[in-house]
Amino acid sequence: MKKYLKLLAVVLTLALAFSVTACGDKEEAAADECWADQYVALIESGEARDFADYDALKEELDKIREECGANYVYVLSPEKDGEPALECDTSDKVDFLITVDGSADPDDWAVNYGWEIQFTEAWDGTPAAARSAWDDEEGQCWSAFAPVYGEDGKVICILGIDYPCGDTIADYPEWNRDDASWNGFEEEITGDVPEAVQAVIDSTTELADKYAKQLSHK
């Protein structure tokens, strides 16, 4: 009986050890499935928001929006033949389309956001902000964008963050492209930037870069 109990104890110990190892392997496998990998699968599937893991991709952007206090957090991809692509030649002014939208009221899939200089800058690897603020329903926002990298080290999309800046823009309306006094800066800022405005540009760009790195393949 004692021998039987000892044998049973050994079997149970081995079974427990195997179970822990198996769980560990599953956790490691899940950790390997990062946001960037899922995004590549989304675009390659051609299924748009019917893609099985779309909700999980959006949920991650929702968390970012809630954590940092942005009005909108979303992802843009370059347009190719009317669809979002994983590659583009930025020597041309390629339009960008919205894909995963972490907003409370998301835009439709592949809405065309046109071309702006900061889209190209981010796609080429440099986090960049818009040259001016803009009017939102809840006040003024400043937008910034940063590259998200895939497994091969190439940019697969850009993360956009629209951050509220109404308090600052109230004192500098010329930095709001929707204001009658707008200074007209679109691609290059050729004048002096007030310290408070520069702080908004820098902080929004840093946010976009921080979260884009979190989404990138590790």
Question: Which functions belong to the PLM regions below?
Answer:
Residues 1-8:
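Bacterial N-terminal signal peptides that target proteins for export
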Residues 19-22:
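C-terminal motif of bacterial Sec signal peptides marking the signal peptidase cleavage site
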Residues 27-56, 182-185, 189-197, 207-211:
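Extracellular/periplasmic ligand-binding regions of membrane signal-transduction receptors
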Residues 62-84, 178-200, 214:
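Short N-terminal helix-loop-first-beta-strand/juxtamembrane motif that initiates sensory/input modules
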Residues 91-134:
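Extracytoplasmic/periplasmic sensor domains and loops in membrane signaling proteins
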Residues 149-159:
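Short hydrophobic/glycine-rich mini-motifs in sensory/regulatory modules
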